[in-house]
Amino acid sequence: MTDALTPVVLWRPHCPFCRILFSGIERQGLEVETRNIWEDDDARELLNRRIGSETVPTVLVGDEILVNPSITELMAALREANK
């Protein structure tokens, strides 16, 4: 895989699903960009514009949007995006 995409994780504090995803990201050693929707107005607006809600975690992988993905789903999306 060359020119690997960096996933963008939209999240918020106290989100148990976000903690689960971040745990998987850490185990896999992935580099991600994180954007806290409670502190980043642009991230919150992006989330509302792209999916029409503030459901987190939402991960952007290129043009693909993953809402509350498992680490397995995220890894599959990265493999597909980096083909």
Language-model-derived ranges and their functions:
Residues 51-59:
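Structural micro-motif
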Residues 2-3, 45-48:
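Short secondary-structure transition/capping segments
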Residues 19-26, 48, 75, 79:
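Class I S-adenosyl-L-methionine
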Residues 16-17, 42, 73:
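Short alpha-helical
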Residues 6-8, 31-34, 63-65:
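Short active-site oxyanion
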Residues 1-28:
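Local sequence-structure signature of Cys/Sec-based thiol-disulfide redox active-site neighborhoods
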Residues 31-44:
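Thiol-based oxidoreductase modules, predominantly thioredoxin-like and allied folds used
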Residues 61-83:
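Non-catalytic, surface beta->alpha helical segment in thiol-disulfide oxidoreductase systems
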